[in-house]
Amino acid sequence: MLRRAVLRFGSDRKANVAIIFALTMVPIIFLLGMTLDYTLALRKREQLNAAADAAAIAAVRPAMLTQTDTAVVKATAEAVFAAKANLPGLSSVPTPTVTVTDTGLARTITVSYTAQSINNFPGVLGKQTWQVNGSATARASSAPNMNFYMLLDVSPSMALGATQADIDKMISATSSQPSYARNCAFACHEIHPNNQNPSSTNKDNLTVARANNITLRIDLVTNAVKQLMVGPWTCPQSGVSGGVMQCMAALNNTTYKAAIYTFDYKLNTVQTLTTPTTAGTQIANIKLMPVDHQNCVIINQCSTDYGSDIAGGLTGVNNIMPAPGGGTNQAGDTPQEVVFLVTDGVEDKLILKSASCDPAATYPLPAVGSTQVRCQQPLNTAACTTIKNRGIRIAVLYTEYLQLPADDWYKKKIAQFNNPSSSTGMIAQRLQSCASPGLYASVQTGGDISDALTDLFIKVASSTASLVQ
């Protein structure tokens, strides 16, 4: 009987569509319920991943990078995650696992979580929740505490007019000067112009430049340093006064100190290491190198003109700087050391006859007495290498040496180092080699030295946080 009924049911074609539909409804409902719950779980995971991203980034912001208590760092990340992870549809707010790894100035934060998304069809899946998990990793290097040593060229070549218009005005304004200083683009500073006491009728070219309101390259350098240490500078962080250094120190929550040195034929101390604000009060003492008169740099030591020893300036600063530290706030650590060299890149100095000048220097070199010669050459980078080998960075701003094709001395002594252009010649190449990677900039005559020096400083001082996963 039962067998016959089953066979009859199997061979009966009436209502077969309804029966098939009824039979397939069970897996269809199962699939629909599972799909809906899975989709909702994925959406929750995306939202929780965003919360983990925010928590990781929050823990590597500049203000947090100075925090050495890992419990505080973890608590900050957990609080940010909890605020963003309080989502409807979760069985509870998940508690993240926060891992803090510090390596020197670098900090890596990993925020991971496991959560339970509530299912709308628990009976279909046979479970009340769907588990989701994820993680986010952020890494940043804190801006280190740094000591900055400004090393500024104040040799006579920095007395060039700041722009072509200033150069033209300088040449015109010196048309009545003695023959050695007449129609000259440089505002050289002589204590005894024409080897006589200064007077209303006997002026050096610097006096002429000031009387005619001519801006010199040294003025632009001075203004650039002022922008760094004094301002005005509009800082994104409210309540910060001063210049770029004070602003970046506040933004990075770090400590900067600054020293100012100049060089001509020797190293000159303007301000030893102190706060940028205190150093800024001494900027007015950045002055052009004075000479007694032409061919007499130092009175009673009259031999020839000279006055630019870049390598000597670097060596002098190197002897002053202590061994660099890591720049962290950890006990016993000390700041990093950074040299900022601003120069036109050409040395003009006395060397022993037994020493060597650049092979491309024009020979015979002018003799100075029985033991010395005058050497004009691009910077010899050996002094730079010595500094960098100590772990000290060098930032270089090259105020490009102006090509002077009409000047006989330039054509004979300098042109071979400054071709095919001031941006690409040997002078520029040597300075770029002197600089630490990424810390070289150049500015042509008429360019904005303040902006160039500020950009270079910000490049040294900047730190960023980034998600790596």
Task: Indicate residue ranges for each PLM-predicted region.
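P/S/T/G-enriched low-complexity
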Residues: 2-8, 29, 36-469
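Glycine-centered recognition micro-motifs in short, flexible terminal segments and loops
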Residues: 2-26
